[in-house]
């Protein structure tokens, strides 16, 4: 993947490069088992947070609200994005170390059903490793006729995701995460039918408007604004390797590494922050030792200097 960054110079408006970008977008939909007629991947130049901005700013109609199932930093980031755009929020708040109570989620949505258009929840809270129940929350959203959006930035490409089985209308990620490319390109995968409806929604942003980017790509086969050329080359290679290894084998490889780390953490007498059944296994959060001799910076520097 790193070698794929070294490529011949090319104008980002060349048809040859547009074809590469189209193939990357199609492959991203395949990763989450979406059908091309139903789902589309829309690419943006930027970090993963740009997709939070895109989703919140583009998918909520004027005078409607977003309900955020909020138990961590990344859900809170979506809440802040909504506040910046003046979008009404129903903040369904839970403790950062606890999974959302589905009964409370449904009760809250039912109470606010007339006002809410979109239900939003992160799949994995990266700070804790907590894995949220997207399938169940998505089912609740659909029961009340709402669009369900999940920030799958830190899981997509490693944890198996199926947009149909997991009740996902929209999900998102960025190039450097689960697909294992390099930083600089993020993407929102969503239902074409709903994106088409957003044409008449409030236009809250110029650069991060989903309809603008989607419709330009649909017509011209390329991104509206300058794409991160080298990063898309790295995505092309990373996706090739993803499909060659296979979803199941890749997931099992990551879980084997996770088990090894957990075993060594336990051997050091350290304690994991969360019960394993609450996590994906991709993030292993450790309780900060109470020993006064523990120095995080020294531990960090030692690991860094030894390439760990």
Model-found features: residue ranges?
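Conserved PLP-anchoring active-site segment centered on the Schiff-base-forming lysine
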Residues: 60-76
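Conserved C-terminal alpha-helix-loop-beta "cap" of PLP-dependent enzymes
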Residues: 77, 266-308
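Active-site-proximal loop->helix
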Residues: 77-88, 95
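Active-site phosphate-binding strand-loop segment of PLP-dependent enzymes
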Residues: 100-157, 170
């Amino acid at each position: 993947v790193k070698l794929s960054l070294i490529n011949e110079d090319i104008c980002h408006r060349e048809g040859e490069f547009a074809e590469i970008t189209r193939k990357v977008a199609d492959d991203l939909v395949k990763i989450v088992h979406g059908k091309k007629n139903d789902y589309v991947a829309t690419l943006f130049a930027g970090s993963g947070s740009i997709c939070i901005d895109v989703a919140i700013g583009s998918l909520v109609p004027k005078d409607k609200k977003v309900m955020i199932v909020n138990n961590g930093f990344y859900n809170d980031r979506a809440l802040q994005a909504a506040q910046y755009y003046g979008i009404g929020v129903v903040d369904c708040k839970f403790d950062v170390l606890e999974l959302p109570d589905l009964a409370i989620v449904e009760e809250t949505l039912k109470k606010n059903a007339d006002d809410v258009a979109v239900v939003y929840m992160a799949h994995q809270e990266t700070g804790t490793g907590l894995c949220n129940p997207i399938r169940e929350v998505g089912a609740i959203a659909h029961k009340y006729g709402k669009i369900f959006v999940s920030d799958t930035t830190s899981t997509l490409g490693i944890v198996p995701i199926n947009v149909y089985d997991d009740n996902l209308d929209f999900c998102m990620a960025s190039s450097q995460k689960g697909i294992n490319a390099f930083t600089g390109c993020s993407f929102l995968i969503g239902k074409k039918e709903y994106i088409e409806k957003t044409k008449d929604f409030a236009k809250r942003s110029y650069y991060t408007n989903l309809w603008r980017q989607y419709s330009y790509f649909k017509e011209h086969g390329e991104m509206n604004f300058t794409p991160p050329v080298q990063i898309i080359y790295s995505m092309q290679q990373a996706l090739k390797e993803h499909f060659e290894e296979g979803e199941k084998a890749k997931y099992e490889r990551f879980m084997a590494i996770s088990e090894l780390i957990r075993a060594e953490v336990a051997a050091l007498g350290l304690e994991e922050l969360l019960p394993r059944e609450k996590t994906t296994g991709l993030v292993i959060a450790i309780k900060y030792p109470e020993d006064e001799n523990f120095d995080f910076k020294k531990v960090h520097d030692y690991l860094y200097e030894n390439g760990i």
